Swiss-Prot record:
Assembly and binders: Component of the Mediator complex, which is composed of MED1, MED4, MED6, MED7, MED8, MED9, MED10, MED11, MED12, MED13, MED13L, MED14, MED15, MED16, MED17, MED18, MED19, MED20, MED21, MED22, MED23, MED24, MED25, MED26, MED27, MED29, MED30, MED31, CCNC, CDK8 and CDC2L6/CDK11. The MED12, MED13, CCNC and CDK8 subunits form a distinct module termed the CDK8 module. Mediator containing the CDK8 module is less active than Mediator lacking this module in supporting transcriptional activation.
Recorded superkingdom: Eukaryota
Keyword Transcription regulation: yes
Lineage of producing organism: Eukaryota, Metazoa, Chordata, Craniata, Vertebrata
Name of this chain's protein: Mediator of RNA polymerase II transcription subunit 21
GO MF: transcription coregulator activity
SUPFAM superfamilies for the chain: Mediator hinge subcomplex-like
Protein localization: Nucleus
Role of this protein: Component of the Mediator complex, a coactivator involved in the regulated transcription of nearly all RNA polymerase II-dependent genes. Mediator functions as a bridge to convey information from gene-specific regulatory proteins to the basal RNA polymerase II transcription machinery. Mediator is recruited to promoters by direct interactions with regulatory proteins and serves as a scaffold for the assembly of a functional preinitiation complex with RNA polymerase II and the general transcription factors.
Keywords associated with the record: Activator, Nucleus, Transcription, Transcription regulation
Gene3D superfamilies membership: Mediator complex, subunit Med21
Stated family: Belongs to the Mediator complex subunit 21 family.
Disulfide bonds: none
Main location: nucleus
Length: 144
């Protein structure tokens, strides 16, 4: 996962892309402007362009990206965060890390104990099968 600044940069780049796409699509689909001095022939048979739908779509995308940017900015550490607050936060994270490490060590220990039990049971099963097979072979041999 990227850090907050990289996420913020990606969101700003995405917002810029959305603005460029919105302007391009609206320019392409928008109705032609009429100039009083210039006579232009407009094809009346052209189908109506869904510019309103595009406008709503791009407005929603831009608004959502702007909200994402606000959330990312709010998640950045503030200037009010003093060294003491940062040290306390770091200490808390270290405690959580030690607790997680202890829990992991306990789980690994229990896993090793289960592995030993399983290996012992498998060895007993293999030994029993060998005894059964050797007993079956000795009984099946004809007496000569």
């Amino acid at each position: 996962m990227a850090d907050r600044l990289t996420q913020l940069q990606d969101a700003v780049n995405s917002l810029a892309d959305q603005f460029c796409n919105a302007i391009g699509v609206l320019q392409q689909c928008g109705p032609p402007a009429s100039f009083s001095n210039i006579q232009t022939a407009i094809n009346k048979d052209q189908p109506a362009n869904p510019t309103e739908e595009y406008a709503q779509l791009f407005a929603a995308l831009i608004a959502r990206t702007a909200k994402d940017i606000d959330v990312l900015i709010d998640s950045l550490p503030s200037e009010e965060s003093t060294a003491a607050l940062q040290a306390a936060s770091l200490y808390k994270l270290e405690e959580e890390n030690h607790e997680a490490a202890t829990s992991l060590e306990d789980v690994v220990y229990r896993g090793d104990m289960l592995l030993e039990k399983i290996q012992s049971a498998l060895a007993d099963i293999a030994q029993s099968q060998l005894k059964t097979r050797s007993g079956t072979h000795s009984q099946s041999l004809p007496d000569s």
